Amino acid sequence: MQLPYAEPLTVLEPSERVVPEPPRRGEDGGEPCGICAGQSTAAVWQDEHFSLHPPVGGSLVGAVWLASREHVDSFSDLSPEAAAAFGPLAARVERAILGLGDVGRVHLYRWGDGGAHFHVWFIPRPLGMLEASGMMLPLWEDVLPNVADEELADAARRVAEAL
């Protein structure tokens, strides 16, 4: 693992804590949920519990995000049926991304700080790009040159077809 920055780096002091935290998109007092309002990229695949979407902008071909069809915030808020479907579906998405080729590993991330609608990211680490292993992959994804949205969407469609 290696940071995508040259030394020396300067460690910042943490900012003052903000309590209570401001509302996120989709929470009372926050902006409307973009997923529920249809403001996100169109789904390339969906079933009764989840929808799969390509990113807008990005540097890693094969990246996709999976959202719950119902407006819930977290794993713990999923219906029992959706929670039971998540694991097998995540495995299928991972296999489909690996099937694109040139992928060393598929990372699964859920941050949840931007919006209150459950979604996870599947991010492929390029084969042989060991400096982007582990927690370094999102940092590298941020600094690598973006690929065309059409290429990202095409890869997402190929992932969907494999499901």
Task: Identify what each model region corresponds to.
Residues M1-L66:
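Active-site microenvironments that recognize anionic phosphate/pyrophosphate groups
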Residues Q2-V18, R25, P126-L163:
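C-terminal helix-cap and adjacent tail motif
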Residues W45-D47, S59-G62, A67, E81, ...:
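Short connector loops at helix/strand junctions that flank enzyme active sites
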Residues S51-H53, G104-Y109:
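A short linear hydrophobic-aromatic micro-motif
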Residues P55, A67-R69, I123-R125:
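Generic beta-structure capping elements
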Residues A63, Y109, D113-L139:
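Histidine-centered divalent-metal-coordination microenvironment in nucleic-acid enzymes
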Residues V64-G87, W140-A148:
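Short histidine-centered catalytic/ligand-binding loop motif
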Residues P80-L100:
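Long, well-ordered alpha-helical scaffolding segments within enzyme catalytic domains
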